[in-house]
Amino acid sequence: VAKSKQTTARKKMLEKLNVEEIRPSSRKYPGIIFSMEREPGNQILEVQDLKAVDTDGTVLFDKVNFNIEKGQKTVFLSRNPKAMTALFEIINGNRSAEAGTYNWGITITTAYLPLDNTAFFDSELNLVDWLSQYGPGNEVAMKGFLGRMLFKQEEVEKKVNVLSGGEKMRCMIARMQLQNANCLILDTPTNHLDLESIQAFNNNLVAFKGNIIFSSHDHEFIETVANRIIELTPNGTIDKLMNYDEYIHDEQIKAHRERMYS
């Protein structure tokens, strides 16, 4: 009897649905696929005794030592968000460290998504010409690439210096895909992205076979992508092979963090 009532209720519910409600979703997801041209070796990145200081004299981090191993997707955390940007700028050769060294493995190729992408868009180039700077391919191929990143046909002639924050971020992600790197460096990558773009980005990073070094404010993004956590402090690092939820709820780590920042 209960089953018969359920069936009747479901039938009534279906009858109430109009065509508007059962239309396919109009949400569009960009085609984000990172692929590696070269398989990485076992030595990815070694950092020794690295130190960075802000322009006002604040120590962002000090005594930073770590060795990134093959297959690791490492999120960097800090109470001072400038610490992660400083680290990423240093290992990309854009900034000098106050002390310490870093060495990339000889098989490693990197693609970097910086926090501030302003300098990339300071030109009168249209989207097709802009993207063509970063990879092989003719105009048709570049238009196809931009189409997968949800740029409409009429938008690809737009000048890059008038793009919105979200459009710039989609261009930067397209640029990274053309680089076919085996190590991705991402400084707060979900900034300016809509939910669909974040989901597409997230899914591809989970599937990516290379290494990822990143920072993010997005809890779900960190939880699903990272398999290693390194926290940068003025007194060294906290370095754990665990997921994000475990890390933030571990009482011993909480106590350790307080000591490291004091």
Task: Describe the residue ranges of each PLM region.
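ABC ATP-binding cassette signature C-motif
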Residues: E37-S262
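Flexible nucleotide-interacting loop at or near the entrance of a catalytic core
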Residues: V1-D62
